[in-house]
């Protein structure tokens, strides 16, 4: 039935990507690829090192455009839902929005080794809401990571190489997808 199709096409966990606002049109590629990989919603976040500053009118038209990109990527990849692209949030609003999610992760280049990543992923269960915070170009400020840690967001590593902001979201999505679907 329909429920089976839904189950087959969608990840067993809902992934919420909090993406630090990148420069130029990188966000379009991030949205397209993360939608292909199964993300549930994407929240653009104005972080300390985000170079881009969008006024309200500009932000609205950007988000509308991003939503269309999400729609076409969802259709093209056979998704049964269209991931929502949220209005731009501040870091404070974003961590508050994520506070009740089951697992909250923040890839951070100063995080040593993959053990924390493995442990965090091993706790994922079907039906969970997973928040993933990605810094913009230039990464996360130390105080953003500290604030995140205070709120139960776990710093993880995505490997020994420093990833660009547009690569980090894809990497964590692919890792989560593999982890959740490798038993099938």
What would you call each of these model-derived segments?
Residues 1-6:
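Short, small-residue-biased leader/transition segments that mark boundaries at the very start
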Residues 7-106:
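RNA substrate-binding interface of SAM-dependent RNA methyltransferases
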């Amino acid at each position: 039935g329909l429920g089976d199709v839904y189950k087959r096409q969608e990840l067993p966990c809902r992934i919420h990507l909090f993406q630090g606002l990148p420069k130029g049109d990188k966000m379009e590629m991030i949205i397209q690829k993360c939608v292909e990989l199964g993300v549930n919603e994407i929240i653009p976040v104005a972080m300390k090192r985000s170079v881009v500053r969008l006024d309200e009118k500009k932000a609205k038209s950007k988000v509308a455009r991003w939503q269309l990109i999400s729609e076409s990527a969802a259709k093209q990849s056979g998704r049964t839902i269209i991931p929502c692209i949220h209005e731009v949030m501040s870091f404070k609003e974003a961590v508050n929005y994520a506070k009740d999610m089951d697992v909250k992760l923040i890839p951070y280049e100063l995080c040593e080794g993959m053990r924390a990543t493995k442990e965090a992923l091993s706790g994922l269960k079907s039906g969970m809401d997973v928040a993933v915070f990605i810094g913009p170009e230039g990464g996360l400020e130390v105080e953003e990571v500290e604030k995140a840690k205070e709120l139960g967001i776990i710093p993880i590593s995505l490997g020994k190489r420093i990833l660009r902001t547009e690569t980090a979201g894809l990497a964590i999505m692919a890792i989560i997808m593999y982890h959740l679907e490798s038993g099938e």
